[in-house]
Amino acid sequence: DKKPYGPLPRDWAHYKGLYVQGNKVVLSYTVGSRGIFEMPSLHGKNVFIRNLHVAPGTKEIVMQVARGAGAQHLDGSGHIVLVKSAGSVTATNSNANEPVIAAAVLGDTGLWDLKDEENLRLRIPASTKAQKLRVLIWSGKRSEVADFSKAVAAVKAESEAPNLMQLTEGGKAKWTETVETKIQSGLATGPYATDTFILPNENPWKSW
């Protein structure tokens, strides 16, 4: 099909690894010259949140958020946008049941790009300071969009954006038990001896 496959060039994007602290996971990657920490989380059962810490940089970066047509703002501030789910077909008289995707941005900055007819994107401008923001994503029926608006208001009122930098500094040990085993010495009957490290088959994690 002549489409390019494989990893992107590192100066475009590069996955660096992850940090685990308790039940939280922080991804580390770069987009262009800007470093990014990202932690996924949920609000309720169906609002997915991308918590982001974006390093300073001289260039704007663009985030792909969803695929869909007919993007429109849902509130006067421009924080919440709505798109039709990609591939959805709706009869004229069943608009309330139309599958849609709604997204919201909370935090330091972020500008919705509604120009593309098939993609919803978020533009994060260049900045001399690190930026913290949260992107909330929801899918459901058009008639249920008000539930998402309430969820956005609740997230904004309940908590600030998590400190992802702090979560990369390490926390309590995940496994505190000590696993002991033995080494069986080999017979020194030749020019060298081979010792055997006995695998700890009996361990709390049943890992062997």
Q: Where in the sequence are the language-model features?
A:
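Solvent-exposed residues in well-ordered beta-strands and their adjoining turns
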Residues: 30-32, 53-55, 66, 125, ...
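Short structured motifs
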Residues: 13, 33-38, 117-124, 197
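Surface-exposed beta-strand/loop patches in extracellular or lumenal glycoproteins
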Residues: 45-46, 53-72
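Beta-propeller domains with acidic blade repeats across secreted/periplasmic ectodomains
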Residues: 160-208
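Extended acidic/polar, glycine-enriched regions
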Residues: 81-84, 88-175
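Hydrophobic residues positioned within well-ordered beta-strands of beta-sheet architectures
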Residues: 25-27, 38, 48-50, 61-63, ...
